[in-house]
């Protein structure tokens, strides 16, 4: 792991696009990953990655030092399923991206 956040994010994007029906796009102006139904499941935000996670992965990600619920407006209205995971835990970003992909792809919307 390089601790270069953008490089780490780009590596996750490359792997996800190569191994799953994933595209890159934008959400709230940030680069993100979307499944083949257009549902965003991960993104790059201010040198971190954010992930939309189900309960087990959500709790695991939130337990990391520096992790928190994603509040893009910074007005105390976090997106409860989304977790910010700092680059210090970038070695887990791909794993969480896979979990997030599975979560949004399997979730009945």
PLM regions: where:
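Charge-dense, helix-prone N-terminal extensions
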Residues: 1-109
